[in-house]
Amino acid sequence: MTTESQAAERLAFLAAEIARHNALYHGEDAPEISDADYDALMRENAALEAEYPHLVRADSPSKLVGAAPSGHLAKVAHAQPMLSLDNAFADEDVVDFVGRVRRYLSLGAEEPVALTAEPKIDGLSCSLRYEKGVLVLAATRGDGTTGEDVTANVRTIDDIPERLRGGDLLSSPPDVFEIRGEVYMAKADFAALNARLLAEAEDPAKARQFANPRNAAAGSLRQKDPGVTASRPLRFLAHGWGEVSALPADTQKGVMDAIAAWGLPVSDDFVRVDGAAQALSHYRAIEAKRADLPFDIDGVVYKVDRLDWQKRLGFVARAPRWAIAHKFPAEKAQTLLKDIDIQVGRTGKLTPVARLEPVTVGGVVVTNATLHNADEIGRLDVHPGDRVVVQRAGDVIPQIVENLSRDETRDPWPFPQTCPECGSAAEREPGEVDYRCTGGLICPAQRVERLRHFVSRHALDIEGLGLTHIESFFRDGLVQSPADIFRLTKDILLTRERWAEVSAGNLIAAIDAKRHPPLDRFLFALGIRHVGEVTARDLARRYRSWEGLKAMIDRTIEARDAAVQAIGETDEKFAARTAKELAAIVETPGVGPEVALALVDFFAEPHNADAVADLLSQLQPADVIHETRASEVSGKTVVFTGTLETMSRDEAKAQAEALGAKVAGSVSAKTDLVVAGPGAGSKLKKASDLGIAVTDEAGWAKIVADAQ
């Protein structure tokens, strides 16, 4: 049974993990997991929140949609949020959906519930705003409240008219009508695009190739240059609407018929059905011809047809109550497992990849499949040469789901204990399923990400040294490690394109200004797993200097090595027990076994130790000098919530810590003061329920001023 503390910890993990996958899928068009695995994470989050409603987080995935917009396109605030849909995975889920509609509307048992049903296109959500029938704005969904302005790009898509036409249903469209739908790429067009990109490449081995039609559509629409979008075969299908000044009908089908009459494409398989039985019959018909459709779909969407019922049903946090997406099961095929390779991700995770005899799954030729982790390899007992069942889950990432050649007399396939990229040790922490490379600072697979983190705002914060420059310097061999950043000179920069006297001088000055970073920023910049800003600050305050911190780390490494030597071969129970003992040596409030073990793994790796020593030849972390002022919040716990209008959250935190207060992220019985700005929600209510003192931003400013 899950305890409350375990549930809170798991919800925090799920919030971060789902946000990461949202960013990969919606923001970078590069998903790492299948739709089915993503849906499983969402269902786990929903189940925990249902059991522990008081633990629902402000950043809960149940409240969020998509991913934040990227930086290279202008942002657009949606007049009405572009929400996601809840999912159905079985016939019973659809029956339950109709039942919930009946109960919510208090309908009689004999009153029919009409639905619309249409294929769920696997594309990129887009809104088209027409004013007086003329297209004035197009935007991506983004995070649901803010998207990206893609108007210029959308104007190049043949399916999308510049001006709506009058139709048999309506002489002219309303003054304002925002049409929503999916930008997609047909399967044949996708294959032709990849073939053209391959033919046009100077080096075929380096040719840009899209993984699937959805990625191709998303990457093509979100271009800075509309000319690139125009060269890509994009299409559009309408499925709904957002802000409107008037509606042409009182049913979902009636409005969609009007949209089609105005000149926007609507699915040929959009129909009206009565109740769950007819909905499921249409689902079966669509599923049967799925492979023959010209575009990828991953299910069927049902919506309550009557708009007055839709209005009464309303919305939950991230989805309407009047609609649901009925997902298709994954498609499968048999093939030969030729080999198992290990890929190292940007964060050091080792992922086994199956190399397969080419096989067609759901109309797509599959040659690779994920094996997830060492435990999954053991569960399947797969070895090169086995016949396996491949599943194209969610139409995105193929995976092996069954081994047809299982032989329990064989030894398990040996998962590598060293990183194939750099040779550093691969470690698996207690309770985790993934092996990770411990050679973070020197591992080629991780270097660019580590370098980007090293110079980021909350780490060394080197102004003017962003990801583009990092990638360029790394590609040309100028910066391979953090220490190399400090070896750059103005003369080196001036030999490169687009660098002038002023820009080169400014960057070198910004780099030199960081040769004495605060100890906590230096520690955070190293990118040690589990050592975030707060943990780095706690360790820096406890040990005050790099010398003091390093002495503690050396003692911890010696203790770990002695324990291993005394007991010989280790297991997870031994590792967990040892980690607790190491945490006692670290002796820092808030730093537990997980962090202690991460510190040991990082600094005990010889490659990392060499990289840190090299870095210390270029800079010297500044010692921590406690400068707290006496104040009415000294020794107390403060929580900031809502919007701060005169300062950033980081500035407020720094002020509180300078006054000797501890800043917490959530309200509890141990909280002494809550500073609430506009938009404060559950934290403010909980503070009121617990009788905790509350002040606003002006009151906080007075506390700070009184301590001067």
Curated annotation (Swiss-Prot):
Its cofactor is Mg(2+); Mn(2+). Residues 628-708 form the BRCT domain. Zn(2+) binds at residues 419, 422, 437, 443. GO terms for cellular component: cytosol. One of its GO terms (biological process) is DNA replication. PANTHER family: CHROMOSOME TRANSMISSION FIDELITY FACTOR 18 (PTHR23389), DNA LIGASE (PTHR23389:SF9). The gene is ligA. Its EC number is 6.5.1.2. Pfam families: BRCT, DNA_ligase_aden, DNA_ligase_OB, DNA_ligase_ZBD, HHH_2. It comes from the Bacteria. Belongs to the NAD-dependent DNA ligase family. LigA subfamily. InterPro entries: BRCT_dom, BRCT_dom_sf, DisA/LigA_HHH, DNA_ligase, DNA_ligase_AS, DNA_ligase_CS, DNAligase_adenylation, DNAligase_N. It catalyses: NAD(+) + (deoxyribonucleotide)n-3'-hydroxyl + 5'-phospho-(deoxyribonucleotide)m = (deoxyribonucleotide)n+m + AMP + beta-nicotinamide D-nucleotide. NAD(+) binds at residues 35-39, 84-85, 118, 141, 182, 303, 327. It is an enzyme of class 6 (ligase). This is DNA ligase.
